[in-house]
């Protein structure tokens, strides 16, 4: 109504037709309760045939916006889907390192590491079936893109395979730099404090320019990955948020 705009699209969470949502990619509306209510009112008629459960938008301060909508009758609720965590590469490289000379990163084959990655995730799903709702392994095509940039590695401990780590140059969320595309350790090597060491080794491999960041999105339930990111110095700089306007069902 005020001449603003919002770039949106209908999407389905993990391709599940029962979980449609409106993805707000960009907008002139501010990331405030008033701005989000304006977007919801404007897009609801256009996407009503799909019966979307929620909006999803990237917002800069998740705790602040959640507090701001609490008690606001225009919203049923709001929650974090994925945290955006980032740090400048040159600063992360200067932080105190976790020393573990057993661990190395070795360039690997996309096909072989994709199969290994799928096996790691399969084992995780068997232990925690709920994880399959929000965590999916990077496939051979995705890992091949990382390999093309020299940023696909097998994690080796005592020269034995231990997992997969991959990154990609990707400018997003207002940042230039590299995205952590994958970090998966097999069961034998999880919960041993190796995650931060892998990230520190990865930082040394990045062909980073001044001002480049290492960033990634981490699901709010993925506590080990959140801890690893914080331990190497990355910070929460935003989040992909589920926003449930009044009259919408909400994302389960």
Map each language-model feature to its residues.
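Conserved catalytic-core motifs of GNAT/GCN5-like acyltransferases
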Residues: 77-89, 235-249
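A conserved beta-strand-loop-helix scaffold within acyl/acetyltransferase catalytic domains
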Residues: 129-183, 187
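Short amphipathic alpha-helix that is part of the acyltransferase structural core
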Residues: 94-138
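Actinobacteria-biased recognition of intrinsically disordered, low-complexity terminal regions
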Residues: 14, 247-252
């Amino acid at each position: 109504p005020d001449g603003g705009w919002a770039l949106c699209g209908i999407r389905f969470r993990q391709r599940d037709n029962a979980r449609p949502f409106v993805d707000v990619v960009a907008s002139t509306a501010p990331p405030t309760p008033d701005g989000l209510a304006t977007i919801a009112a404007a897009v609801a008629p256009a996407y009503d045939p799909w019966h979307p459960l929620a909006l999803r938008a990237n917002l800069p301060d998740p705790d602040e916006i959640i507090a701001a909508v609490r008690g606001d009758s225009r919203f049923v609720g709001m929650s974090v889907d994925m945290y955006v965590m980032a740090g400048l590469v040159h600063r992360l490289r200067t932080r105190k390192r976790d020393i573990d000379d057993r661990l190395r990163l070795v360039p690997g084959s996309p096909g072989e590491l994709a199969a290994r990655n799928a096996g790691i995730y399969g084992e995780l799903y068997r232990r925690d079936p709920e994880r399959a709702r929000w965590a999916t392994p990077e496939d051979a095509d995705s890992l091949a893109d990382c390999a093309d940039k020299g940023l696909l590695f097998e994690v080796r401990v005592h020269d034995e395979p231990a997992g997969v780590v991959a990154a990609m140059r990707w400018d997003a969320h207002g940042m230039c730099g590299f995205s952590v595309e994958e970090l998966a350790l097999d069961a034998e090597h999880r919960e041993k404090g190796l995650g931060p060491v892998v990230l520190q080794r990865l930082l040394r491999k990045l062909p980073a320019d001044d001002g480049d960041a290492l960033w990634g999105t981490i699901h709010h339930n993925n506590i080990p990955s959140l801890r690893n990111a914080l331990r190497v110095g990355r910070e929460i700089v935003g989040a992909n948020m589920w926003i449930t306007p009044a009259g919408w069902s909400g994302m389960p």
